[in-house]
Regions:
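Alpha-helical transmembrane segments and immediately membrane-proximal extracytoplasmic
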Residues: 1-188
């Protein structure tokens, strides 16, 4: 998201021009990919994950929703960052659930909370959203998947102004540390 925002800012001199051109491109893409299935907040996809009909969700739904959401937000359109996380997570969980031996709807519920956790960098909020949406019986499962997704997001968030109470090393910082350690080991 950050990369595309910078790329578009460099590519288009005028923000109005960027929004007009990219809006037209996004509109065409939305119609090409299943006549608008991926437009909006994605609540339609979340509902399809839990309707019990297995043919309604495609294995690529999550990636197309994610790509189009990133493209939309990087083009300068504001709002609608959170609801697509639920949609992306539900679709991904629905697809991965059977791979790990879970019911697709159970996987969709876990994906719902864990992608929100990772995308927003909020551990407790994601667990509570999952519990509020799917019931207290899911608390242990949400706790585990949200903890794992929180650990592996390395303080990244869709919210650029978010402040964190404690910092974890980023992927780049860990790589620098490893390279300096290897360099020191070679020199010694």
């Amino acid at each position: 998201l950050r990369y595309l925002r910078l790329k578009f800012a460099f590519r288009f001199s005028s923000p109005v021009k960027k929004v007009l051109i990219m809006g037209a491109v996004i509109a065409v893409l939305m119609m090409v990919f299943h006549q608008g299935r991926y437009s909006g907040t994605g609540s339609n996809l979340v509902a399809l994950c839990f309707d019990g009909i297995t043919d309604d969700i495609y294995a690529y739904d999550w990636i197309l929703k994610m790509a189009l959401t990133i493209l939309t937000l990087s083009s300068g359109f504001i709002g609608g960052e959170v609801a697509p996380l639920f949609s992306i997570g539900s679709c991904l969980g629905y697809v991965l659930g059977p791979v790990f031996g879970f019911d697709p709807m159970f996987g969709a519920a876990l994906g719902f909370a864990s992608v929100f956790c990772s995308g927003s960098n909020t551990l407790l909020a994601a667990i509570l959203v999952g519990v509020e949406s799917f019931g207290y019986s899911m608390l242990p499962f949400f706790s585990v998947v949200c903890f794992v997704s929180f650990i592996f997001n390395f303080n990244n968030s869709i919210f650029t102004a978010q402040r964190v109470a404690f910092t974890r090393p980023t992927r780049r910082q860990r790589l620098k540390e490893r390279l300096s350690e290897k360099k020191n080991n070679i020199n010694n």
